[in-house]
Amino acid sequence: DKYKYKLHYIYREFNINFFKMDLYPISKHATGFTFKKFNPHIMGLCLTYHVNCKMSTRQTAHVLEEVHGIKISHRTVANYALTAAAVIKPFVDTFNYKPSKILSADETYIKVKGIKHYVWIVMDACKKSILGYQVSDTRATGPCILAMRMAFDKFKEFPGKALNFVADGYSAYPLAKQQFELEENKEFNLTQVIGLTNEDPVSEEFRWVKQVVERLNRTFKSSYRVTCGYGSDEGALYGFSLWVAYYNFLRPHPYNYHRPLNELDALNIADN
């Protein structure tokens, strides 16, 4: 009965070094704004209705014509959104958020051309800002590493063991933690909250952290549903990055007394 004593090992080898990949690539859509027919004010109206008010591109075009008398195609609205996302993404990704030492991570699914894709989110559980995100066609460890790298990059000095990273029970997170220790010598505490009920002391203590990012997922999904899915991988990434810009800098939050999470002087003095 030798088969009873056979040992099985799972061996993982990464063919891509996710720690050398560029976190902040420049999109081909990142160009200057030149308006042939419309102007920056109309573009601002497009983004306000489309992103802030959760309207689809067709609904946005319809409202602009019915309310403002501006005849614009839904394709132009989509192009404005893609260009704005490409231009503002570097600012959002490299802003100094001054994060706390409790991060929360989760993933949710979206559709790209009818095929399931995944959005990875890492947020500051205390200050509520989104620090890292990725869009991928798989639920593998690679995109998880990239999202975590983007979040850790916000620290001027990595806190090490003082950092508590809270996630669900998915296996990608401990594998990513292992790679950070091997490749960058970054050690941090990973806490996995498993299940929907508090069956153990860990879940009871850190359930609130997990619920913060789950509420964020629901907030994003309410804006995502009107899109009926994205048309390309790049469109999905830049569509989500535009929503992150709105969430971090424009959306009123009860946590901050119904003011945006990160207030900018340039926005405070700007008119509508």
Where are these regions (language model features)?
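DNA-recognition alpha helix
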Residues: 57-70
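Active-site proximal helix-loop segment of RNase H-like, two-metal nucleases, encompassing DDE(D)
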Residues: 202-205, 209-232
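Active-site beta-loop-alpha junctions of metal-dependent nucleic acid enzymes
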Residues: 82-83, 133-158
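Two-metal-ion RNase H-like nuclease active-site motif
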Residues: 98-112, 121-123
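C-terminal domain-tail junction helix/linker
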Residues: 226-230, 237-272
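Acidic/histidine-rich, metal-coordinating catalytic segments
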Residues: 159-174, 194-196
